[in-house]
């Protein structure tokens, strides 16, 4: 229903875009609570059924199918309807392959001054297990080739996007096409310059991802002797 609101011409254009954001927020909450609860139930080997009589694995499979279809629909609405409509109103989002030479120079300077100093690559190897990344944060997993400054062979690394920076940045007016206000994505800037964060190494792949963590409270007051302590433990686990 929320997605259909994004297609309704009766709503102002930015409100229609907002409906896509609401849909994403709703999906996050659904996966944090409902899907997380199902996965926890499956992990415990609990095959108790719901009111509809279906097993947890069957419910999870159906959720996956429906969610994938809805996400595809969401991006169709964004790319085929809303972004062209925004562009017709003079608002444009520049992809990496659309940057002009002057825009690339501006992005390079911004990356050097504002992004590189606050981004901390995390190596992945047997001595460094997968890190505890912040819930719903933007990250990149990077495939590397070559050796670093310490002579270590390349492998995999994670780039957490700085949370102190906005996801969208406006290009200076003199760099925009005539009649347009243009923006670039933080993710595009990191992707374009990821190799500069690994001197002496070659980036063979750079892939954007985010984690949605379990936010379902799983404390049973009948099974713990100290409910307050159990709740504190659950809350401490939410630091990420």
Predicted regions and their residues:
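N-terminal non-catalytic structural scaffold regions of very large proteins
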Residues: 1-240
């Amino acid at each position: 229903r929320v997605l259909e609101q994004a297609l309704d011409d009766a709503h102002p254009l930015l409100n229609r875009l907002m409906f896509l954001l609401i849909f994403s927020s709703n999906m996050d909450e659904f996966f944090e609570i409902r899907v997380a609860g199902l996965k926890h139930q499956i992990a415990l080997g609990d095959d108790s059924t719901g009111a509809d009589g279906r097993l947890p694995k069957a419910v999870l499979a159906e959720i996956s199918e429906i969610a994938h279809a809805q996400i595809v629909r969401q991006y169709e609405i964004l790319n085929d309807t809303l972004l062209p409509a925004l562009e017709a109103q003079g608002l444009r989002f520049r992809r990496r392959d659309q940057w002009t030479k002057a825009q690339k120079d501006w992005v390079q300077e911004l990356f050097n001054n504002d992004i590189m100093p606050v981004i901390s690559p995390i190596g992945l190897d047997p001595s460094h297990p997968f890190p505890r990344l912040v819930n719903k944060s933007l990250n990149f997993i990077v495939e590397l080739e070559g050796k670093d400054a310490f002579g270590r062979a390349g492998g995999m690394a994670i780039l957490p996007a700085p949370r102190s920076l906005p996801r969208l940045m406006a290009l200076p007016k003199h760099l925009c096409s005539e009649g347009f206000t243009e923006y670039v994505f933080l993710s595009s800037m990191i992707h374009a310059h990821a190799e500069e964060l690994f001197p002496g190494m070659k980036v063979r792949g750079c892939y954007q991802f985010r984690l949605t963590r379990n936010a379902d409270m799983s404390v049973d007051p009948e099974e713990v002797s100290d409910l307050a302590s159990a709740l504190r433990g659950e809350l401490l686990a939410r630091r990420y």
